[in-house]
A protein has these predicted regions:
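Bacterial N-terminal signal peptides that target proteins for export
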Residues: 1-6
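C-terminal motif of bacterial Sec signal peptides marking the signal peptidase cleavage site
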Residues: 14-17
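Bacterial Sec signal peptide processing site at the extreme N-terminus
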Residues: 19-32
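Short, well-ordered alpha-helical segments enriched in acidic and aromatic residues
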Residues: 46-59, 63
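A short gly/proline-enriched turn/hairpin at secondary-structure junctions
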Residues: 61-71, 82-89
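Surface-exposed, charged secondary-structure patches
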Residues: 75-120
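Short beta-strand segments and strand-loop junctions that repeat across beta-rich extracellular domains
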Residues: 124-133, 157-160
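Low-complexity, intrinsically disordered terminal/linker segments enriched in charged
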Residues: 138-171
Length: 171
């Protein structure tokens, strides 16, 4: 009786400790995130303030193209409000997008090239599943610079950013 009990116990422990290493099927979530990001961009283009900011989590962060633009949601909303009120917002259209998931399938990150009034920009960020919806936790907007033009761009921004570097490194 003792041998049989021990054998069953060993089997229970062995099978109970096995993990399912199969990644969750994220294809429908990938479609949902892509649709959310498209709607997010349309809301900005249409100057729909509440709708646009509803795509962000409560504790979201927006990082803009200027080195000083690292805002929590409340600060970003305050900065953007005049543009939405005057209907002079931005119009971004994704032209190439990649979406990746963590092992749980409830956190994802993306990068995309955007057609904008600034020509090609890169949007990237982190999205999290909140209930049944995907929300933007962090968004980073970057301008792209052709490598052949980097020296020209650096010379244009050097004076401004040298001062900012001094300020930031003296903290």
């Amino acid at each position: 009786m003792g041998y049989r009990f021990l054998s069953v116990l060993v089997l229970v422990v062995l099978f109970g400790s096995c993990k399912n290493n199969v990644a969750p099927d994220t294809s429908s979530d990938k479609t949902a995130i892509a649709a959310m990001l498209d709607s997010f961009n349309r809301a900005a283009a249409n100057a729909e303030y509440d709708r646009y900011f509803n795509f962000y989590t409560v504790d979201a962060v927006f990082i803009g193209t200027d080195a000083t633009e690292n805002w929590d949601k409340k600060s970003y909303m305050a900065w953007a409000k005049p543009y939405f009120d005057k209907k002079t917002t931005w119009n971004f259209t994704s032209i190439d997008r990649h979406i990746f998931f963590d092992k749980t399938g409830t956190l994802a990150w993306f990068d995309e090239l955007l057609s904008t009034q600034m020509k090609i920009c890169r949007g990237s960020g982190v999205v999290v599943k909140v209930g049944n919806d995907w929300k933007v936790q962090q968004y980073v907007l970057s301008t792209t610079i052709p490598n052949s033009q980097i020296d020209t761009v650096v010379s244009i921004k050097a004076a401004i950013e040298d001062e900012l570097i001094k300020k930031l490194t003296s903290k």
